[in-house]
Design a protein with these regions (language model features):
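A short helix-loop-beta-strand connector motif used in the catalytic cores of GNAT acetyltransferases and
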Residues: 52-66
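Hydrophobic alpha-helical core bundles mediating ligand binding, dimerization, or RNAP-core interactions
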Residues: 22-27, 47-54
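Conserved GNAT-fold acetyl-CoA-binding loop/helix
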Residues: 32-52
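Secondary-structure boundary/capping residues
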Residues: 40, 60-63, 121
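Acyl-donor (CoA/ACP) binding surface of acyl/acetyltransferases
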Residues: 1-33, 65-171
Length: 171
């Protein structure tokens, strides 16, 4: 059977990824460009603290951030984090994997649409993000600007309980 051109996307837990890979990923200036809260340098200690904090979200909320693999290779991290009463979705890809954003997002949103705790997700994007067409095509709507840790973000909301056409169940 011929294989499609899209890689096989897997979601694994962050502790499954070597800390050195996380440090290299988060130290890439192309990644840092759109992360205004990333004002510090990453090293092994910072990566270990990051993984521990994200795992604490899993313990507290039963959901959190994953590491993403494409054909078994680490390509980034992201997922859902509870912010007050809302579930925020974040995605931080390695520059070589920027084209995998939609397949990964669709797979995550299909997961969210099956979870009754998540009637909608929010997306917080820095104003430096200009290409927002994919977000709009998914059905996300702009709900305003918000301040997070003293930094301005654009906030979008996407209903996860809507028609299946809005959120594809395949990656």
């Amino acid at each position: 059977m011929p294989r499609s051109s899209q890689p096989i996307i897997e979601f694994v837990r962050l502790p499954d990824i070597p800390l050195e890979e996380l440090v290299a990923h988060m130290s890439d200036p192309r990644v840092r460009t759109h992360m205004p809260l990333l004002t510090f340098s990453w090293d092994l200690e910072m990566a270990a603290k990051f993984v521990a904090a994200k795992e604490a979200c899993w313990q507290r909320d039963g959901l959190g951030h994953w590491a993403f693999l494409a054909d078994g290779r680490y390509v980034g991290w992201g997922g859902f984090q509870k912010e007050g009463e809302e579930w925020d979705f974040g995605l931080v890809l390695h520059p070589a994997a920027f084209g995998l954003g939609m397949p990964i997002t669709r797979k995550a949103l299909a997961f969210a649409s099956e979870d009754p705790r998540i009637p909608f997700v929010t997306f917080l994007l820095p104003p430096s993000r200009r290409n927002l067409g994919a977000l709009r095509r998914m059905g996300a709507r702009f709900i305003g600007e918000t301040d997070y840790d003293g930094t301005r973000f654009l906030k979008y909301r996407l209903e996860t309980s809507g028609p299946v056409g809005a959120v594809s169940r395949t990656a």
